[in-house]
Amino acid sequence: DGVRLTVLHPGEAPPAGEPVLLRGSASNARTCVLRIATDHGVAALLAGDIERAQEQALVRSGAPLAADVLVVPHHGSKTSSSDAFLDAVQPALALVQSGYRNRFGHPAAPVVQRYRDRGITLVASPACGAASWSSQDGQLRCERERSKRYWHHRVVGDGAEGDEGQ
């Protein structure tokens, strides 16, 4: 079908004695990182909840990280989206999955700035709603825009492109 799915993280199996199900922040370290690529050279990277340590390990491993679209690691937390990782992925578009005015402050302002410094279009789910992206035309479609009649309030200050409040 012309699509390749590659699991980049976690590796084969946890080391002997390490539990498969981890709690707390350690469970973020075991999240799935998936690269989806087409035969036409278009790719998306779904980074799950990895943090800086896992990003660095992926960069050092030489894994195929380059992607047109990146689902931002760990909802854009301050422990993710390191310079080295963003330089390896080099996405044109990054999607942040975060709740509107969430208690964690995701995406974190320094993370948003790292994307902006690289000219990466950053779109957050509070502003976009459900996002769909096509590898054929490279277009992002926001459900919030397509179904405006269902949305009764403006989203402000969520750290994404098109913020009304910035």
Go through each PLM region and give its residues:
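Cap/insert and terminal regions of metallo-dependent hydrolase folds
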Residues: 55-132
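Core dinuclear metal-dependent hydrolase active-site scaffold
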Residues: 1-69, 127-166
